Amino acid sequence: MSYTRLLARAVIGGLFIGHGTQKLFGWFGGPGPQGTEQMMQKLEMEPRRHQALTAGMTETAGGGLLALGLATPAAAAGLTGVMLTAIRKVHLRNGPWNTNGGYEYPLVLIAALLTLADSGPGELSLDR
């Protein structure tokens, strides 16, 4: 039995849960709903409240589903959409490297999400 997909799901899902709860509740030093709405306004993503809630809920719920190995392809698809939006609206103009705020990190997350969606969640999952 391989534990690598469980580890990948737990780490990636946990990171997304953390980022989502930063947006929704201000946990872990995050901006909370008002700060996230302001960020969406600066990015010209309207309606900003809807965009902020959608991003936070997708990251939180998608991260939870991914960590549990439940509806893994759907969770990975939703989270990939969030990362593609982050690349397009925030990171692309900064080039590839993370040191300049580039798209390196979200791109790695997308690759990991697509790998999990394709290979499945593994034996230790609720999908099995």
Task: Briefly describe each language-model feature range.
Residues 26-44:
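Membrane-interface interhelical connector segments
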Residues 63:
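Conformational-control "hinges and anchors"
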Residues 1-27, 41, 49-57, 68-128:
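Extended, low-polarity transmembrane helix blocks
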